[in-house]
């Protein structure tokens, strides 16, 4: 409850709300959802139960809080399409780098608005403020006498920013632009 000032009295209340939000957005089992880590701090059987209630094809980028269920023999890894610590995918001709942790020098960052780095981990904390400061300063770099803008498209996909619902890349981009 204290982390991120989440509005839930209990973990069960939070889980119920997050599952409802997920299934409100993810309508079909062919919809793909990339989870950027810290999916569950529970045991394997608890994680299996939650995953079985969620629609769509699920992909996991591992986070620091996922190790408990990942190491549990009861965990059914087949509930995810894949489990990786890092991935690069494409979405409508845009390169998307996926990591639990923000990567300030990511593959493809000089490609402009066709390359994005999506991350989690930092929630809405001082670490996030530091990443935002880096992005803003990178976009206003000065090389010699000319001002040159780097397209530093790091997007914090903290679930609290989206009311705990999965979002499309376009939705995350719009939220990031509105926040800037």
Per-region residue spans from a language model:
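Extended recognition/assembly regions associated with phosphoester-bond processing machinery
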Residues: 1-36, 40-180
